[in-house]
Amino acid sequence: MNWQTFLEATIGQWELLVRLLVACICGCVIGVERSFRQKEAGIRTHVILAMASALIMVVSKYGFFDLAGTNMNADGSRIASNIVTGISFLGAGVIFVRGGSIKGLTTAAGIWATAGIGMALGA
């Protein structure tokens, strides 16, 4: 498969780069706030999460270009739905319960929201 032809037919290289860059910036903004509050997930986590979610959405939307016209059915929305499931497990990992105190709910919600922002930017 010629990747240059693939990118020109579906999404431009600059548009792909801008989408990933904006996802990086959005993840950085959320991560900076979490870092200033010295929470579990900081800048690096949120940037990686936003960029990975955006990239996965780009792949789910444009990655099955070579299957067009074949008998194979590809449903890119399945990939997106699994991002939500995976991020939910990641978010659950930062929630701690000690006695009657629950910590990490806001960070978990931030992780989930960051993934959603990345998905929206990649779609």
Q: What function would you assign to each model-found segment?
A:
Residues 1-77:
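Alpha-helical transmembrane segments and their membrane-interface boundaries
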Residues 88, 92-99, 106, 110-123:
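Gly/Ser-rich oxyanion-binding loop with an adjacent helix/lid
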Residues 28-39, 90-102:
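C-terminal ends of transmembrane helices
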Residues 60-62, 80-90:
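Ligand-binding beta-strand-loop-alpha-helix segment within the catalytic cores
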Residues 48-58, 82, 109-122:
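Small-residue-rich segments of transmembrane alpha-helices in multi-pass membrane proteins
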Residues 66-80, 84, 101-106, 110-114:
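Interhelical loops and loop-helix junctions of multi-pass membrane transporters/channels
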